[in-house]
A protein has these predicted regions:
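Interhelical loop and helix-boundary elements at the membrane-water interface
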Residues: 19-49, 53-124, 141-166
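Transmembrane helix-loop-helix
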Residues: 2-15
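Re-entrant/interfacial helical elements at transmembrane boundaries that shape
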Residues: 132-139
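Juxtamembrane boundary at the C-terminal end of a transmembrane helix
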Residues: 170-182
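Transmembrane alpha-helix boundary/anchor motif
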Residues: 13, 17, 82, 86, ...
Length: 182
């Protein structure tokens, strides 16, 4: 599929396995998580630098011009949504017990995933102003909690801002990388 570049694929796989094995030996904290994710991105970047024409040969040759932006778009979705959940969760861990937020099991995780996906989408379609409506809607829905419980309110605000910031950063990063390909 990569035009005979099995060694590049093997190097990428070994790089990711090495990062994962090292990460298992380090206590899980926000900085160790972010470092691990950065290391995975470095592995991908190293493969791209090592063999920038990987899609120019083999089965994917006819689609090479489309695949690069699509790979960045999908990588950005994964980074903004799935990588963002654990990052925000680890950031918020010290305050979780004090906030004592009651609600459905995993609802915060699902809400965060959906809000990061919406923010990423709004950035990618060139409508980041729509994020203001998302902030307003979430504020209205959380108004009662905010007026009742200051700790829970602060917990939600910090988590929301971290989640929004994460998605915005990945959205604008993906948008910039795609623009560089043009």
């Amino acid at each position: 599929a990569l035009g005979g570049a099995a060694h590049v694929t093997a190097a990428a796989a070994l790089g990711h396995v090495a990062v994962a094995l090292i990460a298992r030996r380090v206590p899980l904290h926000l900085w160790s998580y972010l470092s691990t994710q950065a290391a995975h991105i470095v592995v991908i970047a190293a493969v791209v630098v090592w063999m920038p024409d990987a899609f120019a040969h083999g089965l994917w040759a006819a689609y090479a011009a489309t695949l690069h932006p699509l790979a960045i778009l999908l990588g950005g979705v994964i980074a903004a949504t799935l990588m963002g959940g654990p990052a925000v969760g680890l950031l918020m861990a010290p305050w979780r017990a004090a906030a004592q937020i009651e609600g459905l099991d995993n609802a915060g995780r699902i809400i965060g995933l959906m809000e990061r996906a919406l923010i990423y989408l709004m950035v990618m379609i060139g409508e980041p102003t729509g994020i203001g409506f998302l902030i307003a809607a979430k504020s209205i829905l959380r108004f009662e909690t905010a007026s009742r419980d200051q700790k829970a309110s602060e917990y939600v605000i910090i988590g929301t801002l971290a989640s929004f910031g994460w998605a915005l950063a990945w959205g604008f990063a993906a948008q910039s990388l795609i623009a560089m390909l043009r």
